[in-house]
Amino acid sequence: MAVVNGAFEQVLRDLCGDWLAHNDCALIASGMVGSRQGWKEAPYLDCPAGISAAASQLTTVPVTLANGARRVLHIAPGLRYQEAHGAFDVMRGEETQIWGARLAPGSRCVLPGTHSKWAWTGSNGEVLQFQTWMTGELFGLHAKHGILGRLMQQDHSRMDDFRAGVKLGLVSTGQANHVVFAARTAGLMGQVAPEGLPDYLSGILIGLEVAGASAQDDAVTRSQPVTLIGEDNLCERYGVALELAGLAWQRSPPDATTHGQWLIAKAAGLLA
């Protein structure tokens, strides 16, 4: 949801005002509402971090309802992880989904999207580390604003072309800037029809992501299913890619976000 001109309080009133006027319940939010461009910035927690740490670091925002009643919105913090080479990675909102996904101890999960997240959790459900893969954004940039999109035609999903792209991506780690050009040459050489090129490019990028992100896993971790958290169509695509990589997968419950928010609110003592 896009909020225009910083009118966060008005949007909250429009969406929840009638309900809040008759319910004295806790208000909790997570995700980009707590970003630097959001309602109020909620500081990042350093990994490893779990529900109890998030519950102790909620950022509060005073809210005035249409009837004049005053409430408090609690915003969950995001997470940051510093890799061995010094670069930081961050997430906002995905941590809430991870905690709400009812993962087994010591799991790994993937949250597909514009900025796909791979995360590894500990024995108590805490997020140990994670990686961001800009797969969705790169697809959009290549398909809409680059030369790779010149031959593309939008059509219904072509999974055979997607699978072909995944297979190429899986065996091309370390050659990302080279192999994505195949989404043009495959069209020029007649290997893939214009209608199939978007799926072919998508497959290449997701294949590169799966190969790169899973490379660090040991044999024990690779033997466990990857939990996919997110929108159905994207998760199905990632499921296909994981299977082609020889990895088992499963879906999280659909209420991961709201369940995660409930767990944070409960740990913070906001629930009766």
Residue ranges, per PLM feature:
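N-terminal phosphate-binding loop and adjacent alpha-helix
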Residues: 1-25, 34-37, 41, 150-151
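Phosphate/pyrophosphate-binding loops at sites that engage ATP/ADP/AMP, CoA/4′-phosphopantetheine
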Residues: 14-26, 210-222
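Short beta-strand-loop/turn "lid" adjacent to the catalytic site in phosphate-handling enzymes
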Residues: 19-88
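Glycine-rich phosphate-binding loops at beta-strand->alpha-helix junctions
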Residues: 223-241
